[in-house]
């Protein structure tokens, strides 16, 4: 009785489509159980086709590409530091506008479609800030730490330095010739 019920299963499965797009891709490319030789292992067909090496969806499953950037910025209007998740596609080919949570101002991050004429042909925040003489710091990785020295210059002291006091230990970021 079980054999009779399972005989019609491949026919039923050929008509069923999963709802999720990623499963549809797997389903459409040979992930159905094999019927050749009346093999009795339904799950084995899935396991066999999903572990095959080579081109196709099974090989592409292990490759993960981030589709978003994590943008961290400080608003120059109110000084609020915030973080936004933006699409890579929009950053490189579209328009990205973020809203500051502190003052509710809108900030243009990227304009690849030419919507804003006051940017003078600049396409993204990197080009805009470079034209102003400012820097954009890119940090790669999830556990990355970024330290930026904002005020470059010698520290000023209220007391007059005594003999030999102006030569202190070297700063951690500077190197001295030996």
Swiss-Prot record:
Transit peptide residue numbers: 1-49
Keyword field contains Coiled coil: no
PROSITE patterns: ZF_DNL
Pfam family, one: zf-DNL
InterPro entries: Mt_import_TIM15 (IPR024158), Znf_DNL-typ (IPR007853)
Keyword set, alphabetical order: Chaperone, Metal-binding, Mitochondrion, Transit peptide, Zinc, Zinc-finger
Record's GO cellular component terms: cytosol; mitochondrion; nucleoplasm; nucleus
Subcellular location per the Swiss-Prot or TrEMBL entry: Mitochondrion
GO terms under biological process: chaperone-mediated protein complex assembly; protein folding; protein import into mitochondrial matrix; protein stabilization
Principal subcellular localization: mitochondrion
Molecular function GO labels: protein folding chaperone; protein-folding chaperone binding; zinc ion binding
Positions annotated as zinc finger (DNL-type): 64-161
Positions of Zn(2+) binding: 75, 78, 100, 103
Location of region: Disordered: 151-178
Entry-linked PANTHER family: DNL-TYPE ZINC FINGER PROTEIN
Quaternary assembly: Oligomerizes in a concentration-dependent fashion. Interacts with HSPA9.
Known function: May function as a co-chaperone towards HSPA9/mortalin which, by itself, is prone to self-aggregation.
This protein's name: DNL-type zinc finger protein
Organism of derivation: Homo sapiens (Human)
């Amino acid at each position: 009785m079980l054999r009779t019920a399972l005989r019609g299963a491949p026919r039923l499965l050929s008509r069923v489509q999963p709802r999720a797009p990623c499963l549809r891709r797997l389903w459409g490319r040979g992930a159905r159980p094999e019927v050749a030789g009346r093999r009795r292992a339904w799950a084995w067909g899935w396991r066999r086709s999903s572990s095959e090496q080579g081109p196709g969806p099974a090989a592409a499953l292990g490759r993960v590409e981030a589709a978003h950037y994590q943008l961290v910025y400080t608003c120059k209007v109110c000084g609020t530091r915030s973080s936004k998740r933006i699409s890579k596609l929009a950053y490189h080919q579209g328009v990205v506008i973020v809203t500051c949570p502190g003052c509710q101002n809108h900030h243009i991050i990227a304009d690849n479609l030419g919507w804003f004429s006051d940017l003078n042909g600049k396409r993204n925040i990197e080009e805009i800030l470079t034209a102003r003489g400012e820097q954009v710091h890119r940090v790669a990785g999830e556990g990355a730490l970024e330290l930026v020295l904002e005020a470059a210059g010698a520290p000023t002291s209220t007391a007059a330095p005594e003999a030999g006091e102006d030569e202190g230990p070297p700063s951690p970021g500077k190197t001295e010739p030996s």
